[in-house]
Amino acid sequence: MANSHVAVLAFPFGSHGQAILAVTRRLATAAPSTVFSFLNTSQSNFSLLSSDLPPNIRVHDVSDGVPEGYVLSRNPQEAVELFLEAAPEIFRRELAVAETEVGRKVTCMLTDAFIWFAGDMAAEMKVSWVAFWTSGTRSLLISTQISSEKQSLSKETLGCISGMEKIRVKDTPEGVVFGNLDSVFSKMLHQMGLALPRATTVYMNSFEELDPTLTDNLRLKFKRYLSIGPLALLFSTSQRETPLHDPHGCLAWIKKRSTASVVYIAFGRVMTPPPGELVVVAQGLESSKVPFVWSLQEKNMVHLPKGFLDGTREQGMVVPWAPQVELLNHEAMGVFVSHGGWNSVLESVSAGVPMICRPIFGDHALNARSVEAVWEIGMTISSGVFTKDGFEESLDRVLVQDDGKKMKFNAKKLKELAQEAVSTEGSSFENFKGLLDEVMKV
């Protein structure tokens, strides 16, 4: 509708901003007469907005909540705490600016689920609140339900919750069921868990067929629950608005490799395994002789063993950035070695590629457990950390042994389900249309 004005409130940490911007781009393209005011910190916007946006997305920089002259400690939770303390007032002020600039009142609040206080703001403004959960179905269910049932939990598994029978308490994010329940992150999740059932709609990057039992559970929990993924397929390269970026020639390199032979390694942009583990990964790659692409930030390349880059120049490539989705979808891709972040898991599922997971923090262990024990499309690295022998054994298991063949078979089946979900009249295709209708309401 011509008069709709959607306020998008981003959570400016990790990959959250990137995820909600991707959805906002697609919505804005599908609804050119709707204005989307995108509110995010200047630092996060600077890292995200490298390409042209649809003209109906208006970008607004907001404060990060850090007082002028304040020096942050090395504790990453401090920045989150300062932002959350200041964010309600910061967002309120900028929303007034956005309404003045657009000349329209906000008609819908589209926010990261971590911006839990947006429910109160939407109620004050008498508009709908549409919340985006950026992780998986199991972490959403845990964050909104299990944290209130700690006393009734088994010491080992979450079998008391339908669809969670193979999940262990130790797989859950710290600060939800175990660990420091007074941390900033734990308190934020608790507040969010109480607030989300009030949302008009909760949506996420997944597809119903991946976890049908959990989909049913979440539909009962929320007023409206929509799975609109995998976003890597729904927002496919055929709809790409900017040229493919491959500055290091990864795609030209992989075209020369055999089917299902290449190891792709990437641990995300936020955290990386410690230097000692990077060393043994490098040693394992060199010893195994498998072809590889390793996406590793330049600041971490200093930790690689002396002579590794020269010694493996014909075997593989280490680059500061790689076109992950395109690499995973190449027929030469054999296995994805990852931290187990949700976006990476969904991109691997979308491509039908098995995984080796090395969880680092947050929902990584939960996602890795789903990969290994629920969907059986990969494995978690032995003992949870990289060792040279353990890494080589994992590569051999996935790429060569019968276990790996089963993982590949299961991964291909999930890929087919994912493709069906985003096809015309598929579940995610229809759910995205439902999301679009919701945000366009006046």
Curated annotation (Swiss-Prot):
Transmembrane domains' residue ranges: none
Disulfide bonds: none
Positions bound to UDP-alpha-D-glucose: 322-324, 339-347, 361-364
CDD domains, alphabetized: GT1_Gtf-like
Domain of life: Eukaryota
Keyword entries, A-Z: Glycosyltransferase, Transferase
UniProt-listed InterPro entries: UDP_glucos_trans, UDP_glycos_trans_CS
Gene Ontology molecular function: UDP-glucosyltransferase activity
EC nos: 2.4.1.-
Family that this chain belongs to: Belongs to the UDP-glycosyltransferase family.
Name this protein carries in UniProt: UDP-glycosyltransferase 78D4
Organism for this UniProt entry: Arabidopsis thaliana (Mouse-ear cress)
